[in-house]
Design a protein with these regions (language model features):
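Nucleotide/phosphate-binding catalytic cleft detector across ATP-hydrolyzing
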Residues: 1-26, 32-37, 45-194
Length: 194
């Protein structure tokens, strides 16, 4: 299968601070020492992925909109929220919204609920592109900011998206080709008009 680097497969993360009315753009990237200590998280990892020290690894804990490494995703989000929202008070950050653009099954959704609770959300609201009552053509950023009108206690939101969805398409097609080969369906795959 074609080799993909972590920055091609990683989700783009947007953190919305409803208190300051500011949005921060991040990447689902982490760099760890082989001892398990996290060195960096987010956008600052992008430039380092090609020049990693010998004792460290870089990867994405959220791939194709799904949590692929729960423990690392928790550490990464905790660091990002602390960076942008400050340290959580005793009761945590308050109510948080998770907005995911990919279609998720129940188990994948639960992973996001648990993640937000673990990083300090007191309550969690889940939303995706199936939100009802949104006028067609409304930018998703406006929808997420507007959620504060419905959920008055929202303190922050985390949006999981992909700015370059072509990377996801290339990866998904490469995986499909690999699976067809494994299943002995290469001839059928070649007949598909992809």
């Amino acid at each position: 299968m074609e080799k993909f680097n972590p920055s091609e497969l990683c989700a783009d993360i947007k953190i919305y601070d409803y208190k300051k009315k500011v949005k921060y753009d991040e990447k689902s990237l982490v760099i760890f020492e082989k001892t398990g200590k996290m060195i960096k998280a987010g956008k600052e990892c992008e430039g380092m992925l090609y020049t990693l020290p010998a004792n460290s690894i870089g990867f994405s804990p959220i791939v194709l909109g799904r949590v692929s490494d729960y423990t690392c995703a928790e550490k990464m989000l905790k660091q990002m929220l602390c960076r942008y929202l400050g340290k959580p008070v005793f009761a945590g950050y308050g109510e948080g919204l998770i907005f995911v653009h990919e279609k998720l099954n129940e188990v994948e959704m639960k992973a996001y609920f648990d993640l937000l609770y673990q990083v300090g959300a007191k309550n969690v609201v889940y939303a995706d592109e199936s939100v009802k009552g949104i006028p067609e053509g409304t930018p998703w950023e406006d929808v997420i900011w507007g959620m504060k009108n419905t959920y008055k206690n929202l303190r922050f939101a985390v949006e999981i998206t992909k700015e370059q969805p072509m990377d996801y398409l290339r990866y998904s097609l490469a995986q499909l080709a690999e699976n067809c080969k494994r299943w002995g369906l290469e001839e059928e795959m070649s007949k598909l008009h992809i």
